[in-house]
Amino acid sequence: MRIRRFSLLATVAAATLTLTACGAGSAEPGASNNADTPQNADLTVQVADGSEVTLEETPQRVVVLDYASLDTIDAIGAGESVVGVPQKTLPESLQQYKDTIDVGTLKETDFEAVAEADPDLIIISARQADNQKKFEEIAPTINLATDTEHFIDSSITRIEDLAAVFGKQDAVSDKIDALKTQVDELKSTAEKAGPTLFVMSSGGKLSTYGPGSRYGFIFDELGFTPAATDISNDDGHGQEISFEYIAEKNPETMFVIDRDAAIGKSGKAAEQVLDNKLVNSTTAAKNDRITIVDGVNWYLVTGGLNTLPSLLSELSDSLK
């Protein structure tokens, strides 16, 4: 069995941001230069739970606990505003932020460090949502959790609205047009993959994702055919499966995330986990249609402006 591995270092949202700006001003020395939007502006942000956050001016000191948002902020040229990020699993593509304040991990925030960063905006996602009130005690907080039912459309909306927050609309318009074209092209070819399984390897165990799940957009929005429809989507880490399950479903195509590799955890590589008689009996294995996707992009970053095109490219390239 030959397994293809992608490692693309290029590298939403349940939050829809509604923005209104008024007033004018000049950027402070050393602050990001947001030429497209006044520095003193009232920004009303409607977040995931339907509530609103009002920013009195364009953010100048931002703590970002969501790597997808950090990826987008970097891509639009607003990175100078970032003062703190989780450092432990910071992707290689975002190492330019390694000297900002370490605010803990994606799941365990160092709230003292966040406060010391003196942010005027905090950006979080689903991993930190339970602690939103704690963040709000420090600074205005935006929850940009992914809408899994409309992942691609909501990701594009999030990109557009983050650009508006930082006055960088001109930096994203062409890229978003290219992204939409990429989506349409993939939709037109996805059926070539045949019955498809999307699998995660973690700690030597396997789980799978179907329509309506965290990674269900490949089926629901891009048109890949699910090899299994009996999958429970209650757990964000997928439904645990066995090698026998894979052999029974006999996918023609498999996409695999190596979670351990993505988070820097030691353990058996996904290729080793999958290299057995049952998996090798599948059509996907026989036709070299098992692809190890870039785990960092898929598991940690996912919907950023740089990352999302990379995810789509991995899917497209697997069909060649």
PLM features: residue spans?
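Alpha-helical, coiled-coil/dimerization segments enriched in small aliphatic residues
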Residues: 89-90, 208-239
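Proline-aspartate-enriched helix->loop->beta-strand connector
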Residues: 118-124, 140, 246, 250-255
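A short, structured surface patch at a secondary-structure boundary
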Residues: 61-116
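Extracytoplasmic substrate-binding proteins
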Residues: 138-203, 301-320
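Bacterial Sec-exported substrate-binding components of ABC uptake systems
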Residues: 2-67, 170-198, 259-270, 293-296, ...
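Ligand-binding pocket segment of bilobal, Venus flytrap-like solute-binding proteins
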Residues: 203, 207, 235-263
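Short helix-initiation/N-cap motifs at beta->coil->alpha
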Residues: 47-50, 103-111, 233-241
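Structured C-terminal subdomain patch of bacterial secreted/periplasmic proteins
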Residues: 252-320
